[in-house]
Amino acid sequence: MIRSVVALFVFALLLCGYIVLRPGTPPRALTGDDMAVTRGLGDSILGPVPDVIASLDTTVVTPAPLRAPAPSLNVLTDNARMAETTANVLAGLGLNVAPTPDTTTADPMRDLTASVLSGIGQITGKQVTAGGETPAPNTSLEMLVVQALQQGQSDAYIDTIVNEAAKAGTITVPQGLVTANGNVDTAVLLYSLIEKARAAAGEPPLPPSGANEGVEFLSDDTEFRRVYTVGSGDSLGAIAIKFYGSVDKSDVIYQANRDVLSSPNAIQIGQRLAIPELAG
Amino acid sequence: MMRVLVAMIGILTALQAQPSYAQTVNITADMASSTFTVGARTFEISRTQDPDATLQGEFAKTNRPCPDFCIQPMIIASGVAPIGELEVIAFLQTEVAAGTGILIDARLPDWYEKGAIPAAVNVPFAALGAENPYLADILHALGAIEVNGEMTFDAAQDLVVYDNGAWDEQATRAITSLITAGYPASMIKNYRGGLQDWLHFGLSTVLP
């Protein structure tokens, strides 16, 4: 008898305790560490949260897929520089060219832009294929040119296949290689190949081609300026060869004309570009 | 008798196991969570189900030094509407899901990588400055079209821009740069409360 009274008493005690403590004290005591961010982070590292756990108290988080490679949003261009493209083609041809010392080695803006474009591409869905698969890699411009050169094709042939591929959007083209007519300036690419190959072989650099058509010399009291009017078929790379003898200098012209050029590939027929003297 | 006690404790334990798992912290009275699909990805926004949660760490601070962390205006530029959490969620559900809008996280990548609003795209304010030679590429990706050397934004995306909060000028700078680049103010909205307010409501974040 005594035992059952004691048992009932203990039960009543537990029941009271339960009723008193229950509201506001969920079984899983939560500490300050349970802040939304902290949990959010943990969840996506661990992957999808099972429904049971999610329904307890967790903010459900859909884990993001891995970042896709920077997409080529513009059909014609990407942010690669001529020097890289050239080096890749020469490497593809088996010519061992020492990497060009790039004056603009670190280009944080380029990297930043590439990751921005990748992010926008993922959201707008233009680059991400269904199911989150990474898009098939483009045939590279370098591969096309290497193959054509190995086959001994003519410059005109290379020009045609490169432009067809660029228009179909299957390759991307580096900065400064798009002409005012919107074509790919294959001649400049081929020139750049010769230039680098000569440099690698220890031969002197090619002289500037230096045609004077479209060039004006302006002077005022303080300075002497060269201005070049963009003609049909000009690319920034071609203009750089014309004045400096090197494709790599196209960035000098671009930087001097930032007020009229929104990108190195945005040159227009009739645009008047300042051609600065090279320092030193 | 022992068995009675054990049974009673058992009943108690069973009672204890059931309660308090139903959602009680909704977004609004009739919306517990928001689910939307962008491309191939599905996102869900809900709130932490802990009535006692408080802000922790970086976002619990109230008095960062100004400068550099100064209180930002409600209206950054004429025509740029300030919005709150419900408008951000509605924007994600309708415009972003339909592909006509982009939620822009204007913070630098190191902030973004610590957690962002679901489906936000990181477009750091620095990438939108006129000093970025590749700015035109970003504007094109946002839907701007170049006609005769002029950027036109008729087909461009509607944007909602946010940063860490009202004490953070990264969104202000991003919006100012966008307008300088020609983006119409009427197509930009500012979630001024930013991540601080978002977290203050215990709303979901994702790791990019």
Feature annotation, model-predicted:
Chain B
Residues 12-21:
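C-terminal segment of classical bacterial N-terminal signal peptides
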Residues 201-208:
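Active-site neighborhoods of enzymes that stabilize oxyanions during catalysis
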Residues 108-112, 127-130, 165-169, 194-198:
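Solvent-exposed loop/turn segments at secondary-structure junctions
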Residues 21-114:
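Flexible, polar/low-complexity N-terminal or interdomain linker segments that lie immediately upstream
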Residues 1-7:
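Bacterial N-terminal signal peptides that target proteins for export
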Residues 93-157:
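Mid-length scaffold segments of soluble, non-membrane domains
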Residues 139-197:
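Catalytic cysteine-centered active loop of the rhodanese-like fold, especially the PTP/DSP P-loop
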Residues 77-84, 128-135, 167-170:
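Phosphate/oxyanion-binding active-site loops and adjacent basic polyanion-contact surfaces
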